[in-house]
């Protein structure tokens, strides 16, 4: 019988998970409340969904360990922004908040050890 041992997560996934945990710590330390982690749907994925007062905040977390790949913020292309906006719309529909929700898209980047929190990083396209 051939038994497989559980494999360790890929290094880039572990880096991303660690970044999401650190971003969550930072944002909750700033007074935001966690609504959901790693929301997935056909439209895409949202790393963190938070509440900042009455505002629903969709957060993309980016970690860059090597400057040769470009900065963390530069990796959020217009196509990625569209996917995030579509996933956010699905989340709002599922929670019946489409008509009354005030939302924003934030980005937390790690180009080193310290987080950089960019509020209103982009607006939903379309």
Curated annotation (Swiss-Prot):
Pfam families: UPF0102 (PF02021). It comes from the Bacteria. One of its GO terms (molecular function) is nucleic acid binding. InterPro entries: Restrct_endonuc-II-like (IPR011335), tRNA_endonuc-like_dom_sf (IPR011856), UPF0102_YraN-like (IPR003509). Belongs to the UPF0102 family. This is UPF0102 protein Mlg_2205.
């Amino acid at each position: 019988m051939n038994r497989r041992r559980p494999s360790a997560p890929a290094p880039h996934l572990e880096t991303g998970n660690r970044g999401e945990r650190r971003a969550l710590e930072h944002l909750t330390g700033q007074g935001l409340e966690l609504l959901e982690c790693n929301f997935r749907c056909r439209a895409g994925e949202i790393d963190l969904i938070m509440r900042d007062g009455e505002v629903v905040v969709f957060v993309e977390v980016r970690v860059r360990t090597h400057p040769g790949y470009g900065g963390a913020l530069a990796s959020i292309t217009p196509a990625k922004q569209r996917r995030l906006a579509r996933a956010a719309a699905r989340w709002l529909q599922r929670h019946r908040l489409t008509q009354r929700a005030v939302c924003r898209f934030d980005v937390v980047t790690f180009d080193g050890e310290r987080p950089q929190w960019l509020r209103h990083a982009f607006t939903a396209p379309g």
